[in-house]
Design a protein with these regions (language model features):
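Alpha-amylase-like alpha-glycosidases and glucanotransferases acting on alpha-linked glucans and related
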Residues: 1-36, 40, 44, 91-93
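Alpha-helical packing segments of well-folded alpha/beta enzyme cores
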Residues: 3, 25, 68-72, 153
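Substrate-binding and catalytic surfaces of secreted/luminal carbohydrate-active proteins
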Residues: 9, 31, 52, 59, ...
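Aromatic- and carboxylate-lined catalytic core of secreted/periplasmic carbohydrate-active enzymes
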Residues: 46-94
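Carbohydrate-binding surface patches
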Residues: 89-124
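Solvent-exposed beta-hairpin/edge-strand motifs
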Residues: 124-136
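C-terminal beta-strand-rich structural cap/linker in extracellular carbohydrate-active enzymes
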Residues: 140-160
């Protein structure tokens, strides 16, 4: 199981304040292999750890990112495969995670700017223009580089 928060660690929104960084961390979580665990109230950007033994009402005034969870869950079910091989790399200079999943038919590339910042990123992906599965935008890979605008990117291409 993979999670950003649970009952014995601080809430992700208690230390990731930038919404774009949170969007990237959440997309990163879903791109990882394994079951994604969401902790109660995470969809409302809660910052306080709820009690395990007392009734606790979630404050819904901080935000509602449940629609983002729905989109990422759909990606996990339709684009990613439990049969994928997985490789993770990092661009430490720009705080960007570069993840690749690959089965025998489709390569999947995930670019996650963990600070929500723009940067040019070196990738091992064929030159061309691809559709970002997360927002429908066009992403161009040229000479093994792509431009990340700070938002998470998931690209695919067939290897058959």
């Amino acid at each position: 199981m993979r999670c950003l928060e649970n009952h014995d660690q601080p809430r992700i929104c208690s230390f990731i304040k930038d919404p774009l960084a949170l969007e990237n961390f959440t997309a990163f979580l879903y791109f990882l292999k394994g079951t994604t665990l969401l902790y109660a109230g995470q969809e409302f950007c809660c910052t306080e750890i709820p009690s395990l033994f007392e009734k606790d009402v979630f404050h819904r005034t901080l935000g509602d990112i449940s629609s983002w969870f729905v989109k990422l869950n759909q990606l996990k079910k339709t684009v990613l495969s439990c049969e994928d091989a997985f490789v993770g790399k990092a661009d430490d200079k720009h705080d960007i995670a570069i993840l690749e999943r690959n089965d025998t038919k489709v390569r999947k590339l995930g670019i996650f700017s963990l600070k929500g910042k723009k940067a040019d990123v070196k990738v091992e992906f064929l030159d061309g223009t691809y559709t970002n599965h997360l927002d429908g935008s066009s992403i161009t890979v040229k000479n093994g580089m792509l431009s990340c605008n700070g938002k998470p990117i998931v690209l695919t291409f067939s290897v058959e």
